[in-house]
Amino acid sequence: MSKKKDVIEMEGTITEPLPNAMFRVKLENGHEVLAHISGRMRMNYIRILKGDRVLVELSPYDLTRGRITYRYK
């Protein structure tokens, strides 16, 4: 989905919705990260609920925070 080369993309599940469009996501490898919704998803009013499977982009500099770029159907 991303055109950036220096991001890590992983799949995960939403475990807890937080205020200000932030979410706690449990990744496939067992780690939990704090993630926010990407601007394009926000523009298109894509709803994310607890239990949804999502694609998360992680920066190699801070692996505890990420950006949700896709919600699987």
From Swiss-Prot:
<comment type="function">
    <text>One of the essential components for the initiation of protein synthesis. Stabilizes the binding of IF-2 and IF-3 on the 30S subunit to which N-formylmethionyl-tRNA(fMet) subsequently binds. Helps modulate mRNA selection, yielding the 30S pre-initiation complex (PIC). Upon addition of the 50S ribosomal subunit IF-1, IF-2 and IF-3 are released leaving the mature 70S translation initiation complex.</text>
</comment>
<keyword id="KW-0648">Protein biosynthesis</keyword>
<protein>
    <recommendedName>
        <fullName>Translation initiation factor IF-1</fullName>
    </recommendedName>
</protein>
<comment type="similarity">
    <text>Belongs to the IF-1 family.</text>
</comment>
<dbReference type="InterPro" id="IPR003029">
    <property type="entry name" value="S1_domain"/>
</dbReference>
<comment type="subunit">
    <text>Component of the 30S ribosomal translation pre-initiation complex which assembles on the 30S ribosome in the order IF-2 and IF-3, IF-1 and N-formylmethionyl-tRNA(fMet); mRNA recruitment can occur at any time during PIC assembly.</text>
</comment>
<dbReference type="GO" id="GO:0043022">
    <property type="term" value="F:ribosome binding"/>
</dbReference>
<dbReference type="InterPro" id="IPR004368">
    <property type="entry name" value="TIF_IF1"/>
</dbReference>
<dbReference type="GO" id="GO:0005829">
    <property type="term" value="C:cytosol"/>
</dbReference>
<feature type="domain" description="S1-like">
    <location>
        <begin position="1"/>
        <end position="73"/>
    </location>
</feature>
<keyword id="KW-0699">rRNA-binding</keyword>
<dbReference type="InterPro" id="IPR006196">
    <property type="entry name" value="RNA-binding_domain_S1_IF1"/>
</dbReference>
<keyword id="KW-0694">RNA-binding</keyword>
<dbReference type="GO" id="GO:0019843">
    <property type="term" value="F:rRNA binding"/>
</dbReference>
<dbReference type="InterPro" id="IPR012340">
    <property type="entry name" value="NA-bd_OB-fold"/>
</dbReference>
<keyword id="KW-0963">Cytoplasm</keyword>
<dbReference type="Pfam" id="PF01176">
    <property type="entry name" value="eIF-1a"/>
</dbReference>
<dbReference type="GO" id="GO:0003743">
    <property type="term" value="F:translation initiation factor activity"/>
</dbReference>
<keyword id="KW-0396">Initiation factor</keyword>
